[in-house]
Amino acid sequence: MDKLLLWMSVFTSLLSEAFAQTDLNQKVFVFPRESETDYVKLIPWLEKPLQNFTLCFRAYSDLSRSQSLFSYSVNSRDNELLIYKDKVGQYSLYIGNSKVTVRGLEEFPSPIHFCTSWESSSGIAEFWVNGKPWVKKGLQKGYTVKSSPSIVLGQEQDTYGGGFDKTQSFVGEIADLYMWDSVLTPENIHSVDRGFPPNPNILDWRALNYEINGYVVIKPRMWDNKSS
């Protein structure tokens, strides 16, 4: 019996290290190297088909090459929802494997606060970088983002949960990631930018379910890019 209890204790400890629910306020995921093995898998609080969403996060990288910032894959589509930084000042949003690209002024290297929202009824996608709105774009009007996703930070999924390419990997720090099943108002976006997110119900940095794979480290956030 003692051996069984000891084994269960060790198993529970190992499991808690691999899979955790944590308040990561004022902390970052550090992706310190280019790789095809280092990533964080996120487990959403709410799993449902999405006809609206808003996603916000902070990121800090000194890479000028393209890199994946947020990868949401389903069995039928690898780029069901993808945020991809093509280069400095240029980002692409993929929904259902279709994409739009948005461009704007951006300091480099410098931390960014990035938000995007999309509504199925109009197909309109909105973008906010460091609290400032960028040009709206339109894609996939009438579409529904599929449920049961594999959500990954640090890599771009070319297959469900895998198919990583180190030349698309993120190198840097990610923090304050939140996701809602609704389109936030401009006032809400500014609240998120100031550090007061209004009750995220899909992904919540303050109560995040995640699994670290490979060389990813949690550290205190030493930078701030709040714009207001």
Curated annotation (Swiss-Prot):
A Pfam family of this chain: Pentaxin
UniProt cofactor(s): Ca(2+)
Keyword Methyltransferase on entry: no
Domain of life assignment: Eukaryota
PROSITE patterns assigned: PTX_1, PTX_2
Primary localization class, coarse: secreted
SMART domains with a match to the protein in the record: PTX
Protein's cellular compartments: Secreted
Molecular function per GO: calcium ion binding; carbohydrate binding; complement component C1q complex binding; identical protein binding; virion binding
Glycosylation sites: 52
Swiss-Prot/TrEMBL keywords: Amyloid, Calcium, Disulfide bond, Glycoprotein, Lectin, Metal-binding, Secreted, Signal
Stretches assigned to the Pentraxin (PTX) domain: 25-224
Positions with a binding annotation for Ca(2+) 1: 78-79, 156-158
InterPro entries to which the protein is assigned, alphabetical: ConA-like_dom_sf (IPR013320), Pentaxin_CS (IPR030476), Pentraxin-related (IPR001759), Pentraxin_domain (IPR051005)
Binding site for Ca(2+) 2: 156, 158, 168
Residues spanning the signal sequence: 1-20
GO cellular component, one term: extracellular space
Disulfide bond annotation, renumbered to this chain: 56-115
Family to which this protein belongs: Belongs to the pentraxin family.
Record: disease: SAP is a precursor of amyloid component P which is found in basement membrane and associated with amyloid deposits.
Protein name per Swiss-Prot or TrEMBL: Serum amyloid P-component
Species of origin: Rattus norvegicus (Rat)
Gene name of this polypeptide: Apcs
